[in-house]
From Swiss-Prot:
SUPFAM superfamilies per the UniProt record, alphabetical: Pectin lyase-like
Signal peptide coordinates: 1-19
UniProt-listed GO biological process terms: cell wall organization; polysaccharide catabolic process
Organism encoding this protein: Aspergillus flavus (strain ATCC 200026 / FGSC A1120 / IAM 13836 / NRRL 3357 / JCM 12722 / SRRC 167)
Family: Belongs to the glycosyl hydrolase 28 family.
List of catalytic residues: D217 (proton donor), H291
The enzyme's E.C. designation: 3.2.1.-
Name of this protein: Probable rhamnogalacturonase C
This protein's GO CC annotations: extracellular region
Domain of life, source organism: Eukaryota
Keywords, comma-separated and alphabetical: Carbohydrate metabolism, Cell wall biogenesis/degradation, Disulfide bond, Glycoprotein, Glycosidase, Hydrolase, Polysaccharide degradation, Secreted, Signal
Top EC group: hydrolase
Disulphide linkage map: C40-C66, C219-C236, C338-C344, C366-C375
Amino acid sequence: MQVKLFYTLALWAPILVSAQLSGSVGPLVDFKTKAKNKTCDITDYGAVADGKTDVGPAILDAWGNCSTGGLIYVPPGTYSLATDLELKHGESTAFQLDGVLARGHEGSYQLILVRNCHDCEFFSGNSQGAVQGYGYEYLQDGNYGERLFRFQDVSDFSVHGFAAIDSPAYYLVFDTVSNGEIYNLLVRGIADLGMTDAFDIWGQNVWIHDIEVTNGDECVTVKSPASDFLIENIYCNLSGGTAIGSLGTGTNISNIHYRNLYMNQADACYLKTHNGDGIVKNIVWENVIVHGGPYPLAVNEAWGKDVGSTGVQVQNLTFRNWYGENTANSRPAIRIECDEDVPCYDITLDNVNLWTEDGDYVEWSCANAYGSGACLQEAKDTGDLATYTTAVTVTATPSYSATHMPGDFTTNPPSTAPFTIPPMPTSFYPGATPISTLLSLSGAGGL
């Protein structure tokens, strides 16, 4: 198990963590202090936990009174949310979701938008809070609805402790965020439809850890621009997997560290571009277990629609301590195919052991990629890299043992009925203890 170095300076202080982070993450003031300053219980503003009455106006009124220096409290119970929420301009605020917000209408873009918020925390105090999207009502017919969450222009923040269930589209989007901690979260939904990304994140200095995802598209995905991310203890349990991209013009991604990734029928690395421009550099994927997935380790610079321009420069990627297998040997277990106009370089595969669930050989495919390991060519001078394409057939079975998680799904969840909200998981990677324990508060702020 990879040793993690972290220090808690005080109950109310942000956390300092090692690896790729560039500074402290999390709220500047703890939720208990905010609750002592002022608490706005939504039932005092007319909210009724009957699963029918729209709770939106009560939440907006509570936010208006407590969004500066206070805590908004959603007590246990099921509340119908028939209003798209825009929670904006929060300053030193906390939102404690101990009940269930159930989508009660056909909305437009996202059910809950948190924007322009500094020193804020969105969390469940009893670790039983959830947002129920009833996405099956759309998805069973091949249609899509609104996203569940968007956090936009948020800094010095944390999001933790609740479940996002059955979204009609994307689950959680983190748009231009900084100095954040995202952890102890569960995403559970239909696993056979795209456009249902669980976590799409771009920004600076973000720690994502202890996450479980079941969905039909990407699990934890880094978008551009992004820098100084630590992503660890990730359990993609029937999902598209962890990815970077897709990328376009002006790409700027650097200093991203993935570690302790567990993939059940999911891909651990899919870096995808098709032309575009800019740079991706200094990325590490280490301590990875893959059980199934079409492309467990893939860099594909001819993916999807051609967005024009000269190509994205990809450099200094490290893949270390990988174990597992893909679903079919008709697809390369290792695929590193870079743009012929801007070849990749400084790519390192160190102790990568990937086999297949189907057959007695695997393929490796490399194109215009330089470094060490698999089918990569060595570069003597990165200033003048020739184009090439090569494929290697491997028949020698690697010697390794890759643990299975007891919670692995073997069949897709049903797509024609509401999801039961499961309890929060307590394990996200074999042998790794979650970094932060689940909260078990009673009442607002645990006071």
